[in-house]
Structure formats: C-alpha cells, structure tokens
Amino acid sequence: MASNPDFLWCKEERKQESFFKVLKRSDMSSEDTRAIPYDFVINFSDNELSGDMKFRVQWGNSWKVKISKNPRFYFMEKSGWEKFVIDNALGDHEFLTFTHKGQMSFTVKIFNKDGKEMMQPPQSRASFASSSRVKTEQDVKREEEVLVSSDSRSRGPTTAAETNRGGSYKRKLNFGKKKAEETQTYKRTERTQNSKRTERVVSKERVYAGEPSSSVAGFKIFISKSYIKSLAIPKPFGNYMPKEKTRVKIHHPDGEKTWKVVFVVKERGQIFSGGWKRLCKEYPVVFGDTCKFTLITPLELLLVVSKP
C-alpha cells in the first residue's frame, strides 16, 4: 500500500518539539511572555539550555536570543527577544509557533490575528519612524517658506522686479507641494502592494485540489445546523491528519482559549466529534458562521470564525 507523503510529513513533524505564544502589545516583553514552557524545557539538557536559541522565519531572516533562568523557569533574555519582536513589528495579537529543528534552532511561523501566515517581512517600525521624520522636516521647511512669503506681502508695495521674483517663488513652492503630494501617494500605493504580498494563506480551492503546501494547510467551511454537533472534515485536508482516532487542540486567535477535540476516522471520512459541541458553545460558533482552520502543528489548529 502506497504511503501518503502529506501524512508522513506530519508524522515526522510530530517528533519535533514545539511551543506557541500569542503576543499582545501590553505585555509582549514581560518575563512571563518570554518564558519557555516547562513541558518543552524538560526535553533538553542544562547544557543545551545554557546557550542561545536561533529563530528563523519563513523569509529566511534569523535572530539569536540568549536563554536565562530564574528560580521558577527558563526564559528568553529581553534584549534578543525585543529585537526579534521589533524587527517583525509584532504586538497585535499575533500567534507564533516555535518548532525545534535541532541544536536549539527553531523555525518560527507567524500568524496574524485574522489567521493569515506572514510570508514576507512587514514594513518595520524603524522605516515608519524614518518616513515620519522626513515628512516632518519637509513640512517644517514648507511652513518656513510660507512664512517668508507672508512676511514679504506684509511689507507693503513692491517693485516690478520683486513682484516677478515673488511669482517665480510661488510657482516653485506650488511645484514642490505637488511633488511632495505625488511622492506620498506613491508611497501609500507601494505600502498597500507590499502589505498584500506580505500575507499569504492556502485557499480553500488549493486545499480541495489536493495540492500539498510546504508552509501551511487549512480549509474553510460553512456551518450548517448539523455541523454544531460534529464537523465533517474535507477529504483533501484529511491527508494532513493522522489515519487513526486521536485528540487535537484547537486555539482561539486571542491565545487565551483552547479546546481539545476528538478527531475520528470513519469509512465515509473524518470528523471532529467529542469536544466539538462544547467548542461551538464557548467560542461561540453558530449556524451561518464560516470557520477557517489553519494547521499550525501536526495536532494543533487555529480557528478563526467569520460572522455573516
């Protein structure tokens, strides 16, 4: 019997230790946020935990973060952690998964609060600050020019030569203003295009076509009345799941709620059964909603619900 490559990939991924974090602006640099989960730490020796963690994101950039320890837990040192957070403009309830690849190197996947995975670096806060500073200097210069023009008018009658110079100066000022407006419009358009390129998610059609994804798998489904008790899983997505009954963890995008749901394999397909009804009540999920599931680890999914 031929083996399923997607299932083998998930099976191999399951052997790798991983943990997740949800970053909120209010406490994204606190020691608790930087803590490394105990269930993860116990798989490593003290020697391994005395060095650095290396983070690598989907677009190839990497960061080194030192590990420290207090009487209660291991945690990531603030300097390296904050550089990673600032460089990626994090802090808006992003969902991060850290998968160990050996020798304290980690693949980090970043999901925005709408469930989309970041595939390219966002425009950094530093560049925002830089553009704001340039804009401010231009505005100040423009204001100074306007003040000079107003002052010249307040001095009373002028000669013909002065009038000509004033007209030339006014045309120059208007041209500069028009040029600045065109530049700002171009920058806004460029930022919008970059933002669209930054985020990518595997669409429902791609998963249904059975095309394997090297980055993220997921599906969308409309909730009918019967789907409140148990949820049928699209067959192509089932290729990423185990071939036997197991328990999976489903996360709310706020990072504070999780549910354990039984994944059942039947002759007619796979379903979410035990625990699903409770999830629908607590999330909540109701008839008419659209659920988007994103596979973040082999046995963990992120659920984002859209209301009609």
Curated annotation (Swiss-Prot):
Compositional bias segments (type: Basic residues): 168-177
InterPro entries, A to Z: B3_DNA-bd, DNA-bd_pseudobarrel_sf, Plant_B3_domain
Biased composition (Basic and acidic residues): 134-145, 178-198
Annotated region (Disordered), positions in chain: 117-198
This protein's record includes keyword Cell division: no
GO CC field: nucleus
DNA-binding feature ranges: 19-114, 216-308
Subcellular location(s) of the protein: Nucleus
Domain of life: Eukaryota
Protein's UniProt name: B3 domain-containing protein REM23
Organism for this UniProt entry: Arabidopsis thaliana
Location (main, coarse): nucleus
Keywords on record: DNA-binding, Nucleus, Repeat, Transcription, Transcription regulation
Lineage: Eukaryota, Viridiplantae, Streptophyta, Embryophyta, Tracheophyta
Gene Ontology MF terms: DNA binding
UniProt biased composition (Polar residues): 121-133, 149-166
CDD domains in UniProt: B3_DNA
Gene designation: REM23
